[in-house]
């Protein structure tokens, strides 16, 4: 590995350990020429994943787009950034585990909503209203009613 300070080609590995929940290897290295210590990360290169949009266009999977949508939907809500990043991680892992080269925005949106409804119902409704593009109030009200029914069925008082 080339030293970032003196550009010498040889360095030795001082320490190696797993990073990023086992998805990467972190290595501490020392340059054999100038003794400068630096860190490198080794990751598996994921095959490009294409997203098929509703209009048929294809573009590369973009975690940041999902995160931006979550941030907008959770604005002024008690949802931590770490929780939103975890949703994005979950969605990406689920999509990549399918083993497909292409995935629809419909499936990605459903995965996001499955995680978001359990985190914050208001953020879920905001996300769903943009994602599902409700055509009229009755569809929107049905979505709200589904959340209310789910909340009632999962509350401790509903076991009586």
From Swiss-Prot:
Span of domain ATP-cone: 49-139
Which UniProt keywords are present, listed alphabetically? ATP-binding, DNA-binding, Metal-binding, Nucleotide-binding, Repressor, Transcription, Transcription regulation, Zinc, Zinc-finger
Q: What's noted on cofactor binding?
A: Binds 1 zinc ion.
ZnF (unnamed) residues: 3-34
- Pfam families (alphabetical): ATP-cone, Zn_ribbon_NrdR
Task: Report disulfide bridges, numbered on this chain.
Answer: none
Superkingdom of the source species: Bacteria
Enumerate the InterPro entries for this protein: ATP-cone_dom (IPR005144), NrdR-like_N (IPR055173), RNR_NrdR-like (IPR003796)
* Cofactor(s) listed in the protein's UniProt record: Zn(2+)
Q: Give GO BP annotations, semicolon-separated.
A: negative regulation of DNA-templated transcription
What terms describe the molecular function in GO for this protein? ATP binding; DNA binding; zinc ion binding
PROSITE patterns from the entry? ATP_CONE
Its function?
Negatively regulates transcription of bacterial ribonucleotide reductase nrd genes and operons by binding to NrdR-boxes.
Its family? Belongs to the NrdR family.
The protein in question is named Transcriptional repressor NrdR
Source organism (scientific name): Enterococcus faecalis (strain ATCC 700802 / V583)
Gene that encodes the chain = nrdR
